[in-house]
A protein has these predicted regions:
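Active-site nucleophile and cofactor-binding loops and adjacent substrate-binding regions
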Residues: 6-14, 34-43, 110-114, 139-143, ...
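A short, small-residue-rich loop immediately preceding and capping a beta-strand
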Residues: 22, 29-49, 54-62, 133-146, ...
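A glycine- and small-aliphatic-rich helix-loop capping segment at beta-alpha/alpha-beta transitions
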Residues: 23-25, 49-60, 64-65, 152-160, ...
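Active-site-proximal loop->helix
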Residues: 43-86, 90-97, 181-185
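Active-site/ligand-binding loops adjacent to catalytic centers
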Residues: 89-103, 156-273
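Active-site/ligand-binding-proximal alpha/beta "capping" segment
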Residues: 97-161, 257-261
Length: 276
C-alpha cells in the first residue's frame, strides 16, 4: 500500500491541484469573484488563490459542519463566508444560485477545469513509481471529483500509450453518505447504475434523490469532507468506473478512524475521509 500525500500543497489540501486551473480560467474570462460551497478544504484553497489574484471569494458553508482550523484558513485569506442551514448539498445549491445572480465564477468540481487540474495527482503518483501502474487506485467518495479526474487521466494516458495497463479504481463511501454505493451496487430498486455507453439511468438517480427528500434522509458522517448526498460528478464517476472495471463500497466512521490510526502509526497525517 502506497499513500499519495497532498498536504504539501500551498493551502495544505489536494484541492489546490484543481483550484489552480479553475482560478486561472476565471482570470482568463475576467471574473471578479469566485464562488463555491465547501466543507473546509475548498474554502481555504479558493480563498488562497483568490487572494493571490486580487479577486473576491464567497464561500457557502453548512452551518456548524466545518472544523475551526479550516475556517481560520479561509478567514486568513479574506474570504467571505456565508453559513447555510443544512448540509453541503444545501450550501452547494445556494452557491450556484448566488453565482448565477451575481455573475460569479463557480470553482466547485462541477467546473471541468477543476477536474483537469486534479488529474495531476495521478500524474505525480505514476511519475514517482516510474510509470509502473498499480493494481488499484483508491479514493474516498464525496462529490466524486477525484474519481472523475483519475478516470479521465487513466483514459488519456492509456490512449496516448504512456501506460499499458489499466488500474482499477475503488471508491469508498462513508456509511452515512453512500449514494454512489447504493446506486452502483443496486441497493435501490434492485437496479445497478452504470455508464451504459454514455446513457446512464438519470431517472434512477432522480428517483433516489426524490426518495431521500421524501424520507428526510440527510448525509451524516464525522468525515465531513465526504458528507455529500448528491455527488455532482456521479455521471463522470460512472464512466471512470466502467473504464477501469472499478468497485464501490462503504465503510463505517469507526473503520475510517482505524484507517487514520494506521496511517498515523506509519508517520503520516491524514483527515478522516482519507482514513476510508
Amino acid at each position: 500500500l502506497m499513500l499519495q500525500p497532498e498536504g504539501y500543497n500551498p493551502s495544505g489540501s489536494f484541492k489546490d491541484n484543481g483550484m489552480s486551473t479553475a482560478v486561472t480560467h476565471a482570470k482568463m474570462v475576467q471574473a471578479k469573484k469566485i464562488i463555491c460551497a465547501s466543507t473546509g478544504n475548498t474554502s481555504a484553497s479558493a480563498g488562497m488563490f483568490a487572494a493571490n489574484e486580487n479577486m473576491d471569494c464567497d464561500v457557502y458553508i453548512p452551518e456548524g459542519e466545518i472544523a475551526p482550523g479550516k475556517l481560520s484558513q479561509a478567514y486568513q485569506f479574506g474570504t467571505q463566508l456565508i453559513q447555510v442551514k443544512g448540509n453541503f448539498d444545501d450550501a452547494f445549491s445556494k452557491s450556484l444560485e448566488a453565482s448565477n445572480q451575481s455573475n460569479g465564477y463557480t470553482v466547485n468540481s462541477i467546473n471541468p477545469f477543476r477536474i483537469e487540474g486534479q488529474k495531476t495527482i495521478l500524474y505525480r503518483a505514476l511519475e514517482f513509481m516510474n510509470w509502473e501502474v498499480p493494481d488499484w487506485i483508491i479514493y474516498p467518495g464525496g462529490a466524486l471529483g477525484n474519481t472523475s479526474s483519475c478516470g479521465k487521466a487513466i483514459m488519456e494516458l492509456y490512449e496516448w500509450g504512456w501506460i499499458k495497463k489499466i488500474p482499477r479504481i475503488a471508491v469508498i463511501n462513508a456509511e452515512g453518505a453512500n449514494t454512489l454505493d447504493v446506486l452502483y451496487n443496486g441497493k435501490f430498486e434492485g437496479i445497478e447504475l452504470r455508464w451504459n455507453d454514455g446513457e446512464p439511468d438519470i431517472e434512477l438517480i432522480e428517483r433516489y434523490y426524490s426518495k431521500m427528500q421524501k424520507d428526510g434522509i440527510r448525509p451524516k458522517t464525522k468525515a465531513t469532507a465526504i458528507q455529500i448526498g448528491k455527488p455532482v460528478n456521479i455521471i463522470k464517476a460512472l464512466r471512470a468506473l466502467e473504464f477501469t472495471n472499478g468497485v464501490v463500497t462503504t465503510v463505517t466512521d469507526s473503520e475510517m478512524l482505524d484507517g487514520m490510526t494506521i496511517v498515523g502509526l506509519n508517520g503520516f497525517d491524514c483527515e478522516m475521509a482519507s482514513g476510508s
